[in-house]
Every structure is written in C-alpha cells, then in structure tokens.
Amino acid sequence: MPGTLIIITAPSGAGKTTLVSGLLERDPQVNLSVSYTTREPRPGERDGREYHFVDVATFRALRDRGEFLEWAEVHGNYYATSKVWLKQQIATGRDILLEIDWQGAQQVRKSFPDAVGVFILPPSLEELEARLRGRGTDSDDVIMRRLLGARGEMRHVGEFDYVILNNDLQCALDDLVAVVRASRLRYANQHERHLQYFDFLEQD
C-alpha cells in the first residue's frame, strides 16, 4: 500500500520547523524528506538531517542530471527534492513529510496529485517580523527581503487543502497532527488497507 505525501509550506518565521519537529515526535509513522539546499547551515543544523547542504555547482549538476523532483530559488538560495528517494519511500508505504515553498508544492503535485497540502500562516505580518528579528541570525536587509517574500507566498494559501494559523504553538501542533491522521482516513487509503472488506461492500 503506498504511503501518504504531506506537503508543508509556510513563510520563513511562521513556525514551520518547530511544528514539523513536534509532529515527528508525536507521530512516529511520519518520515521527514531531507531536501537539498545551497544555503548555509543554521546553528544546530547538521548535514543529512535537516538538509543536504551543497554548493551551487553541485546543486546545478544534480539538477541538470534530472535528480530532482522539484527545485526552486528562495531568498537567493536553491532548494530541491530528490525524485528517486521520494518515489521509493511512498511506494513502500511510508508517510513522507515534505517542507517546501509554494512553487515546489505546485511542481510536486504534478507527480503526486493525491498529496496533502498544508499551509502554515503566522498570526500577522507584525508578529512574523518580530519572530524573524527574535532569531538574531539575519541582517535587517535579509529580514525585509523575507517579509516581502512572505506576502507573496501567503497569496497562494488558497492552493492548499488545509490552513493552520500558528497563533498558539500547541494548538497549531494539535491541528497539524489531526490533519495527518485525517489524511490516512481518506477513502483511497482505507480502500488500500482493507481491500477485501471494501470489495465485499461494493459487490452488487
């Protein structure tokens, strides 16, 4: 039985990384897809865990060989998803969580139309700016660029199946866990899990 692909998208600073970490702790059936990126690692990040950190030349070589399912440039850095790895994981029944931007989500859904799309919103742009400044890792120019990008990203919220407003971290995490559980109860998934039972029910 194939697994479920869950796409998580959010503007930088909306709390996506924290929510994803919480989901992985609460639901051991979910596995995180590790994307490729050319950005510098943040404090505490490790190559192969949060991302595969590569230089631009390596990224372009992988892209040109057709290794990526999708790729995008965000805030001057490249991000991409491994095509072969993702298809193998889904085929073997694993639920995979993919953290990508809205552009990447559009590309992925061409290959995985049944993927579940979740968009995480900050409570306001003012709160988003406060969170970005609270990180203490970005310059004012980078923060302003991220805020401008966030407004553009949030215009695509209507392209997603579920929207979570991250005003309270625990409530937002509960919502995300509920979305993942609900995705497993869709007809197509339940039919695959209980094929004989459903075939019996659908007999004339």
Swiss-Prot record:
It is found in: Cytoplasm. One of its GO terms (cellular component) is cytosol. This is Guanylate kinase. It is an enzyme of class 2 (transferase). It catalyses: GMP + ATP = GDP + ADP. Its main location: cytoplasm. GO terms for molecular function: ATP binding; guanylate kinase activity. Essential for recycling GMP and indirectly, cGMP. Pfam families: Guanylate_kin. Keywords: ATP-binding, Cytoplasm, Kinase, Nucleotide-binding, Transferase. Residues 3-181 form the Guanylate kinase-like domain. InterPro entries: GK/Ca_channel_bsu (IPR008145), Guanylate_kin-like_dom (IPR008144), Guanylate_kinase (IPR017665), Guanylate_kinase_CS (IPR020590), P-loop_NTPase (IPR027417). PANTHER family: GUANYLATE KINASE, GUANYLATE KINASE-RELATED. Its EC number is 2.7.4.8. It comes from Aromatoleum aromaticum (strain DSM 19018 / LMG 30748 / EbN1) (Azoarcus sp. (strain EbN1)). ATP binds at A10, P11, S12, G13, A14, G15, K16, T17.
